[in-house]
Amino acid sequence: IVQDTAWDGYEEIPAWIMQGYGTMAMEADDQLHEDGCEAPTHVFIQAGVGSLAGAVQGYFANRYPKTPPKVVVVEAEAAACLYKGAAAGDGAIRIVDGDMPTIMAGLACGEPNTISWDILKNHVDTFVAAPDWVAAKGMRMLAAPIKGDTPVTSGESGAAPFGTLACIMCMDEYQELREHLGLDETS
């Protein structure tokens, strides 16, 4: 089995996969530059085991060492092992066992990649445990955008970060988080 999660004794292949994810971050950064964005202020990224999130965080932290973007890692609420580890504040890995009922099947992992956790626990600004309705909202908004924007077809796992951003920006109960993250018209 080739997979992107790592544990003691199985780290080489997950590290290669994370390098590939880092290339995706570089390509996204290149597109931002082509569109006139000097540097991103925020990055919202989904996480299951955290490999994609760790690679993206690592890329942007290295690319913009003096002014890295604020990174928000979004997990399925039912499997939020990274969120639980960050909330504990002791740097230790947390595992979510048992059933993880969620529509975000790609994020229902419950156990962090040990390589990515070392990156994420030290560099991520905010971890979010998103309920299913947030991912569903993200899917709907991406599929039916405002006039002039191109529709995007996304599954639940991919739409979770967009739904999270939309909720933070539009819902009064997330005003404190919005202010904490510094999300405004200049973001």
Report residues per predicted region.
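Glycine-rich phosphate/pyrophosphate-binding loop at beta-loop-alpha junctions
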Residues: W7-N122, R178-S187
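Active-site-adjacent helical/loop segments in soluble small-molecule enzymes
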Residues: P112-D184
